[in-house]
């Protein structure tokens, strides 16, 4: 297993404090076997100010959906997002383990705006999407550690949907 795969496996097993960021230069095969995200039929999407290919898969050993965001030439993993991560626990558990985030950004869950729901720990390469009112963490994003001012241009994804 690679260091990226090992780190994701430790995170999956419930240790948020063990996550210190996606290693710079991580390639898609480096995520195996912790993440199974086949390279076929990726979608293109905005990641910060960049365009990325998104591969959809699962966190190995679970039914948790995983997204692997890679550079357009698929050479480097920029971000791994995991939906409904039970290993994160409730929002208050995250705060107990990691303390207050460096950034609290507004995001949305579907069509519901959630002010301050994107908790960014840029020095850890971690963003936690929390609905404090419902006591639920609904997404985590894993990336290479950065300065707080770099997060929005490199890794930010606005998740809200518009009503028709």
Tell what function each PLM region has.
Residues 1-117, 121-123, 131-164:
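Short helix/turn-capping signatures at newly exposed starts of structured segments
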Residues 128:
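Terminal recognition/anchoring or ligand-binding modules at protein termini
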């Amino acid at each position: 297993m690679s260091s990226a795969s090992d780190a994701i496996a430790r995170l999956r097993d419930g240790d948020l404090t063990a996550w210190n960021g996606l290693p710079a230069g991580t390639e898609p095969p480096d995520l195996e076997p912790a993440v199974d995200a086949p390279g076929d039929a990726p979608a293109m999407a905005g990641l910060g100010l960049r365009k990325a290919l998104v591969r959809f898969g699962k966190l190995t050993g679970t039914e948790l959906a995983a997204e692997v965001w890679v550079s357009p030439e698929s050479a480097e993993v920029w971000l791994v997002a995991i939906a409904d991560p039970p290993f994160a626990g409730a929002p208050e558990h995250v705060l107990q383990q990691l303390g207050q985030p460096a950034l609290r950004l507004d995001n949305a869950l579907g069509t519901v705006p959630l002010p301050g729901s994107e908790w960014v720990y840029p020095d850890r390469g971690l963003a936690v999407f929390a609905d404090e009112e419902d006591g639920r963490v609904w997404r985590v994003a894993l990336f290479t550690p950065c300065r707080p001012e770099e997060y929005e241009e490199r890794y930010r994804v606005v998740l809200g949907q518009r009503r028709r």
